[in-house]
Amino acid sequence: MSVKIIVPSLGESVTEATIAKWYKKEGDPVKTDELLLEIETEKVTLEVNAPCDGTIGKISKTDGANVAVGEEIGEINEGAAANTAGTNNESAKAQAVTQPTSEKPVEKPAVVNNILAPSVQKLVTENKLDPNNIKGTGRDGRITKGDVLETINTPSAATSTPTVNKTNEERVQRVRMSRLRKTIAQRLKDSQNTAAILTTFNEIDMSKVIALRNQYKEEFEKKHLVKLGFMSFFVKATIEALKLIPSVNAEIDGDDLVYKNYYDIGVAVGTEQGLVVPVVRDADKMGFAEVEKAIGTLAKKAREGKLSMADLSGGTFSISNGGVYGSLLSTPIINPPQSGILGLHKTEERAVVIDGKIEIRPMMYIALSYDHRIIDGKEGVSFLVKIKELIENPEKLLLNL
């Protein structure tokens, strides 16, 4: 009896996907819930597992094919896995009897690319890691992104791949754009072509918020089991600024302006596959600890490729922190259909004038890119001034002033 392999439901409003990679070929034995393939949507990569024990009977859609939800992409001949495995074992025993023993130690076989997810293989290659020395914690011992990232943080755990002199043919690598990368490219270009994007800047003295964090970070972590970062301060300050300037939390829908009375804040996260913006829902109803936990959870899921469509959908305003990469100044691009995005940057000590005296202070440039069709210049400037006021006086955030 054959069992169909079909494209699963991909979330609300998502009807198409692309087959990223098959991990099995026709004739391979499989067990229930064993990984068969990965498919990519516009925002996430999803795994498709075997619905039963058996053998791959047919693969009707190969790597790179565009497929629809519910479409048949292959078949499993049910119940044949055990028999196939038994045959393979007998064959292996026969070979063991007839093959002469070599005096030279057999080298440990290299991990073949096709048992690594594309994103994992890319990360391994970019960091020149030997996958044989990475302990896999995924299903059936598969290496996950988290395993690779942990290895990168403890470099002694993996042996670097020796540098090889490349031929002229190997100096250029042509790689098909992933569905996520194509979506990012299209959305950013659409944003530039549709919105009247304008960027305004300000700078913040981070002295007080740094002092407050340093004073309470250990006590905060001990009580809430999460580290106190700066992003929670900026999320809370952003919400207060959005309440003051409602147009920044609005969007254009045809001939209508839609003002949103809720605050779902997107926080941009860079991954090896590209930039994603998971959403912290109803952030205005959260305390600092809840915001930090939500951001930490979403960032971890993003790095491991486990974000769901629900994690990425919606959002009324976004925050992007280029400072973690060392950026001093940038003009972030609006994430449509939102009307604004806040850009944070690297905190750097600079000479500033305080009460007529030159002092060294930790300063950060902030930027607001906004859609000038809906937000006036005065509103954009006032929005940043409010954030500056709250971050430079963090007690106002704590006292809800």
UniProtKB/Swiss-Prot annotation:
Start and end residues of each Lipoyl-binding domain: 2-77
Stored CDD domains: lipoyl_domain (cd06849)
Enzyme category, top tier: transferase
Enzyme active site: 372, 376
Entry's Gene Ontology BP terms: L-lysine catabolic process to acetyl-CoA via saccharopine; tricarboxylic acid cycle
Coiled-coil region: none
EC number of this enzyme: 2.3.1.61
Keywords: Acyltransferase, Lipoyl, Transferase, Tricarboxylic acid cycle
Boundaries of every Peripheral subunit-binding (PSBD) domain copy: 115-152
Cofactor: (R)-lipoate
Domain of life: Bacteria
Pathway participation: Amino-acid degradation; L-lysine degradation via saccharopine pathway; glutaryl-CoA from L-lysine: step 6/6
Molecular function per GO: dihydrolipoyllysine-residue succinyltransferase activity
Entry-linked Pfam families: 2-oxoacid_dh, Biotin_lipoyl, E3_binding
Modified residues (N6-lipoyllysine): 43
GO CC aspect terms: cytosol; oxoglutarate dehydrogenase complex
Catalysed transformations (reactions): N(6)-[(R)-dihydrolipoyl]-L-lysyl-[protein] + succinyl-CoA = N(6)-[(R)-S(8)-succinyldihydrolipoyl]-L-lysyl-[protein] + CoA
Entry's cofactor comment: Binds 1 lipoyl cofactor covalently.
PROSITE patterns: BIOTINYL_LIPOYL (PS50968), LIPOYL (PS00189), PSBD (PS51826)
Family assignment from sequence similarity: Belongs to the 2-oxoacid dehydrogenase family.
Assembly description: Forms a 24-polypeptide structural core with octahedral symmetry. Part of the 2-oxoglutarate dehydrogenase (OGDH) complex composed of E1 (2-oxoglutarate dehydrogenase), E2 (dihydrolipoamide succinyltransferase) and E3 (dihydrolipoamide dehydrogenase); the complex contains multiple copies of the three enzymatic components (E1, E2 and E3).
Matching NCBIfam families: PRK05704.1, sucB
Role description: E2 component of the 2-oxoglutarate dehydrogenase (OGDH) complex which catalyzes the second step in the conversion of 2-oxoglutarate to succinyl-CoA and CO(2).
PANTHER family, A to Z: DIHYDROLIPOYLLYSINE-RESIDUE SUCCINYLTRANSFERASE COMPONENT OF 2-OXOGLUTARATE DEHYDROGENASE COMPLEX, MITOCHONDRIAL, DIHYDROLIPOYLLYSINE-RESIDUE SUCCINYLTRANSFERASE COMPONENT OF 2-OXOGLUTARATE DEHYDROGENASE COMPLEX, MITOCHONDRIAL-RELATED
Name by which UniProt lists this protein: Dihydrolipoyllysine-residue succinyltransferase component of 2-oxoglutarate dehydrogenase complex
Organism listed in the record: Rickettsia felis (strain ATCC VR-1525 / URRWXCal2)
